């Protein structure tokens, strides 16, 4: 068997074992594709054993707000209680996803970093003035929705959150816990 094929089979075995232990790993940018994969895994676990805990491990630089909120909404719809564990990085929409756990179940590893900021529009936007105005209003609505998520998750005031996300705000796991984004820091798998 060629080495590449053997590695692919090994990866399949590892992925199956992790899914069977109700662990979902989100270790990539938030895209339509990565969101669809996460949603399929969430629903597989929900349909095979509803109400049983799921651990959602996040190491993501963020990405699409719409794709991220698709995952968020599905997590909120299932009956299985979800624990989030940030390892490495949860930035931008990745940080939002880290907040979708049940209360008291938002964790990070000791060297994890969290970055929060306001949404942005990538690339170049062209069009008529009216179209640009529509885009501007939509991104402000998205910003308000993200502020609401951070306010609810942290207990901070909307004014504090709006100031915090005005620019990229980088935090260590300890700083994120003090800010209210995390409930604890994991030093062992046994802490789950």
Curated annotation (Swiss-Prot):
Pfam family, any one: CLP_protease
UniProt keyword Metal-binding, yes or no: no
Physiological role: Cleaves peptides in various proteins in a process that requires ATP hydrolysis. Has a chymotrypsin-like activity. Plays a major role in the degradation of misfolded proteins.
GO biological process: protein quality control for misfolded or incompletely synthesized proteins
Organism: Chlamydia trachomatis serovar L2 (strain ATCC VR-902B / DSM 19102 / 434/Bu)
Key word Signal present: no
Family the UniProt entry places it in: Belongs to the peptidase S14 family.
Cellular compartments annotated: Cytoplasm
Protein name: ATP-dependent Clp protease proteolytic subunit 1
EC number: 3.4.21.92
Xref: SUPFAM superfamilies: ClpP/crotonase
Main EC class the enzyme belongs to: hydrolase
Lineage: Bacteria, Pseudomonadati, Chlamydiota, Chlamydiia, Chlamydiales
Alphabetical list of Gene3D superfamilies matching this protein: 2-enoyl-CoA Hydratase, Chain A, domain 1 (3.90.226.10)
Organism domain of life: Bacteria
Signal peptide, first to last residue: none
Substrates-to-products reaction catalysed: Hydrolysis of proteins to small peptides in the presence of ATP and magnesium. alpha-casein is the usual test substrate. In the absence of ATP, only oligopeptides shorter than five residues are hydrolyzed (such as succinyl-Leu-Tyr-|-NHMec, and Leu-Tyr-Leu-|-Tyr-Trp, in which cleavage of the -Tyr-|-Leu- and -Tyr-|-Trp bonds also occurs)
One function term, GO molecular function aspect: serine-type endopeptidase activity
Bilayer-spanning residue ranges: none
InterPro entries assigned: ClpP, ClpP/crotonase-like_dom_sf, ClpP/TepA, ClpP_His_AS
């Amino acid at each position: 068997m060629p080495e590449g094929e053997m590695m692919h089979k090994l990866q399949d075995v590892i992925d199956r074992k992790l899914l069977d232990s109700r662990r979902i790993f989100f270790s990539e940018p938030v895209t339509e594709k990565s969101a669809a994969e996460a949603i399929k895994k969430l629903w597989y676990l929900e349909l095979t054993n509803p109400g049983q805990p799921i651990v959602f491990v996040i190491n993501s630089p963020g990405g699409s707000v719409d794709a991220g909120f698709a995952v968020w909404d599905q997590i909120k719809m299932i009956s299985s209680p979800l624990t989030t564990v940030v390892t490495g990085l949860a930035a931008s929409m990745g940080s939002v996803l880290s907040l979708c756990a049940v209360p008291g179940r938002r964790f990070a590893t000791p060297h994890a970093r969290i970055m929060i900021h306001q949404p942005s529009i990538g690339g170049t936007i062209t069009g008529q003035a009216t179209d640009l105005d529509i885009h501007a209003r939509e991104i402000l609505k998205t910003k308000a929705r993200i502020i609401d998520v951070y306010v609810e998750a942290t207990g901070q005031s909307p004014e504090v959150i709006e100031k915090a996300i005005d620019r990229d705000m980088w935090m260590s796991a300890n700083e994120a816990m003090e800010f209210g984004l995390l409930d604890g820091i994991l030093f062992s798998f046994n802490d789950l």
